């Protein structure tokens, strides 16, 4: 990760604070995390306070770390997913990888995040691995998908 790469991602949105989420999503696509150097750059370029930036990043469970997360698993816990046992899915994944919800693992490779909505209510409980929809109907298969993403 270079400052030039970060600049290329953030600069097109200079002076557009309403595009914070767009910038964050681009950083997540590239690094699967928000590099700490990007925080200051977003603050300067977008004209937002660090509190405003942190509130958005924490709401979307975007990890701020200089070690790119290899695998970002999102488990929807909104009402329709909750009613379809999203908590069991989350617990199964966390047990399988000795992970804590909403925290990057000690080795920096995995984040299992509880999210408020993935807009996949018809596929409840909804799970995304690195932004891709996956089925949570077979928990063992889900663990295999995550292992493949970590490989």
Show which residues each predicted segment covers:
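Signature of N-terminal electron-transfer/Fe-S-associated modules in redox systems
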Residues: 1-151
